[in-house]
Amino acid sequence: MDPLLLIGAITAGGVLIGGGVHFVPVGGAPAAMATATGVGTGTAMLAAGAGLTGLITAAAMTGQSPLMIMAAGAVGSMLMIGITMLVGNLIYVFGVGTVPVSAKVSVDPITGMEQEKYVTPGTEGHGLPTVCFVSGIIGGALGGIGGGLIYWALNEALKTLSYGAMGAAGVAAIFAVGIFFINAVIASYNIGGTIEGFHDPKFKRIGRGIVACLIASIVAGALSTLLVYGGVF
């Protein structure tokens, strides 16, 4: 693989990952106590979990076309984040006894259902309303596509060296996981805590986050290229 193509693929994948993290609804500790909307965990942790699942499904398509690998990554990440949000809602509704609503909007942008009268006083919402669920699925898809693209590029580059097919796939997956974490953490710092999805005012920070991930991914791509073609492997 051409070194510039490798850097470009890693950069594009990193930007997709960083952008996708901004779509994922994360409420942190307050959400775990049903006092904020979103999944009750950290931004980087949830995004990385979805990304790792996407990398597993992308790696399962090793040897297929790049589009198939990226599609598999997207499906894996979407399933992981979708199941997480679904189970979370089941706990919020049937365990805690709260209605999935957001305090950031008066009506759900997708369903048009009123939100304000269902928000428990003293909270910022609870559960995962439809807009958060859809936003999370979009974020998972973007992250999975980005991770799959990075995996494919690294795998193609490593196959031309002394590695066998299994060795190339393993090293490519490890590299892809590292690059995924870098961009997930950068996006998490840019968000600065919790976010509900594309309807959250914090979503406006996505431009700055994408620029930061772009720079970090270019550096990561350049370092990866030096390692791959510089004799390390």
Curated annotation (Swiss-Prot):
CC per GO annotation: cytoplasm; methyltransferase complex; plasma membrane; vesicle membrane
Expression induction: Part of the probable mtrEDCBAFGH operon.
Subcellular location: Cell membrane
Keyword Oxidoreductase: no
GO molecular function terms noted in the UniProt entry: tetrahydromethanopterin S-methyltransferase activity
Annotated membrane topology: Multi-pass membrane protein
Organism of this sequence: Methanothermobacter marburgensis (strain ATCC BAA-927 / DSM 2133 / JCM 14651 / NBRC 100331 / OCM 82 / Marburg)
Annotated protein name in UniProt: Tetrahydromethanopterin S-methyltransferase subunit D
Key words of the record: Cell membrane, Membrane, Methanogenesis, Methyltransferase, One-carbon metabolism, Transferase, Translocase, Transmembrane, Transmembrane helix
Subunit (UniProt): The complex is composed of 8 subunits; MtrA, MtrB, MtrC, MtrD, MtrE, MtrF, MtrG and MtrH.
Superkingdom in the source lineage: Archaea
Transmembrane spans: 4-24, 39-59, 67-87, 133-153, 166-186, 209-229
Any Pfam family matching the protein: MtrD
Pathway annotation from the record: One-carbon metabolism; methanogenesis from CO(2); methyl-coenzyme M from 5,10-methylene-5,6,7,8-tetrahydromethanopterin: step 2/2
Alphabetical GO biological process terms: methanogenesis, from carbon dioxide; methylation; one-carbon metabolic process
Reaction catalysis annotation: 5-methyl-5,6,7,8-tetrahydromethanopterin + coenzyme M + 2 Na(+)(in) = 5,6,7,8-tetrahydromethanopterin + methyl-coenzyme M + 2 Na(+)(out)
EC number(s) reported in the record: 7.2.1.4
Family, as annotated: Belongs to the MtrD family.
